Structure formats: C-alpha cells, structure tokens
Amino acid sequence: MAALPAGAKAPVFSLQSSDGKKLNLADALKKGPVVAAFFKVSCPTCQFTAPFLERLYESYGGEKFTLWGISQDDAADTREFCQEFEIEFPALIDDYGYPVSNQYGITNVPSVFFIAPEGKIQESSVGFSKKDLEKIAVATAKATGTPPVSFFKPGEVIPDLKPG
C-alpha cells in the first residue's frame, strides 16, 4: 500500500509525545489543520527536511495550526534528534510495529500530510519535494488566514526532489 493520497480520510490516532503527553488527532483538528510528518532519526532525507518543517511551525504554529513529527524511533532517540536539529514542534512516538505509520500507508520517510480540519488529507508528500512542501505552506497559510511564507530562504540552494 502506498501512502494515503490527497482526498483520503485521515485515520484518527492517539500517540504519546517524546515528553510523555498523550495527543490525538481528533482533538487537534478541532482547533485547525494538522501537518503530520512521519520520520526516522537515521534517515538523511528526514534530517534534511526537519529544519524546513520547523520553519513552517515557527511561522504558523499556535492556536490555529498543529504540526507534529511522528517518529518511528524510541522517545530517547527522538528527543536527541529534536535537540540536534533544533526542532521545537511536538514529536510523537509511533510504537514498535508502527501502527499509525501502517494506517497511513507509510513505506518511505519522510512522509508529510496536511490534514484539513474536517479530517481529509488535503496535501501529501513523500521524500523531500520542494513543490509539495510549498503547497503545504500555502494550504497552511490559507487555513490559518495568514500571509504565505516560504519554507525556503532567498539564496538557498535547495534540490527540487530528494528521495526518502
């Protein structure tokens, strides 16, 4: 099974964060859209993508928008990853066996989903795709009623695509 496409209903889930808080998708969607970014700490493409997701979180995170990293690693390794890459958005732990990753059809990481408040996947991206991440930024801006900001800074040399 491939990752769930745009238009699919997002499976509802509850996971524990790396700091021990229980978080669930249904509650998060009540306040606005959710970006769920699945990753592994050892994945070079995930390491490359994480700082761009942090930029999105810094630009839009708050009362109208949620961004979660969903780690396929244990809490200790996930906390270390977040510290190393200066990640402030919450990191949730998908327990051994990856039940949530499996529900979303994850075969490659990073896999990033923009989930609209009604629970449908509006945008999805597998690997690093500059175009897909820009679409997610635009969808986030529109959903939060704020001006769009770019993931990418002027002068940065960013590949269009980097497989996961």
Task: Locate predicted features.
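Short, glycine-anchored, charge-dense loop/turn motifs used at functional sites
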Residues: 20, 113-122, 126
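Nucleotide phosphate-binding site architecture
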Residues: 16, 44, 122
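Non-globular targeting/processing and membrane-anchoring segments
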Residues: 1-34, 79, 84, 105-108, ...
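Short, internal strand/loop/helix patches
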Residues: 83-118
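Structural microenvironment flanking redox-active thiols in thiol-disulfide oxidoreductases
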Residues: 47-85, 99-100
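Short active-site neighborhood of thiol/selenol oxidoreductases, capturing the structured segment around
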Residues: 25-47, 53
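Cofactor-binding loop segments of dinucleotide-utilizing enzymes, especially the Rossmann-like FAD-
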Residues: 40, 72, 117
